[in-house]
């Protein structure tokens, strides 16, 4: 049930673009719905892997973004330093002597830092944004078309689990 929030974040980051492929799997324990789910989304230039697990003794709300120049890890349950920027990248070295069987991957690591993020109440901010959208007659970030896109992804993922 937390995947809906992750999908909303991905939808926002992707500016509403739909994935080109959706695959999902899960396991049922103790009830008729999946307790553990894995959803894989493919977009034009990258992939997303979501894991939801309400049985795990370790509660995590993390988002990892791996880019060509840097990597980010956002840990929502931490009280401080929720965002860590890794000055790290991976590059595939190519050349005449490198084939599919012996390609070379080079990892470059330059350290990490955590930018300051002012602690705020996410629920309050969401309600205030919605209120402001009504007062100013502007479209909210969580609008009907965004909700429909996220719902369609969830529906396809759920159907994949029942195959």
What spans do the regions from the language model cover?
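Rossmann-like dinucleotide-binding domain that binds NAD(P)(H)
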Residues: 1-58, 64, 77-78, 145-148
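A generic structural signal for secondary-structure junctions
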Residues: 14-15, 88, 162
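A generic structural motif
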Residues: 42, 66, 84-88
């Amino acid at each position: 049930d937390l995947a809906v929030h992750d999908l909303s974040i991905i939808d926002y980051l992707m500016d509403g673009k739909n994935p080109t492929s959706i695959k999902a799997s899960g396991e049922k324990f103790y009830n008729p719905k999946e307790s553990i789910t894995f959803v894989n989304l493919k977009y034009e230039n990258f992939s997303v892997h979501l894991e939801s697990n309400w049985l795990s003794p370790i509660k995590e709300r993390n988002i990892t973004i791996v880019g060509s120049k840097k990597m980010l890890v956002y840990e929502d349950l931490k009280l401080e330093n929720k965002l860590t920027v890794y000055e790290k990248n991976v590059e595939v070295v190519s050349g005449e002597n490198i084939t599919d069987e012996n390609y070379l991957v080079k990892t470059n690591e330059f350290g990490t830092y955590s930018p300051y993020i002012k602690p705020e109440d996410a629920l309050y901010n969401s309600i205030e944004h919605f209120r402001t959208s009504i007062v100013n007659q502007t479209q909210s970030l969580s609008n009907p078309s965004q909700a429909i896109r996220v719902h369609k992804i969830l529906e396809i993922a759920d159907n994949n689990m029942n195959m």
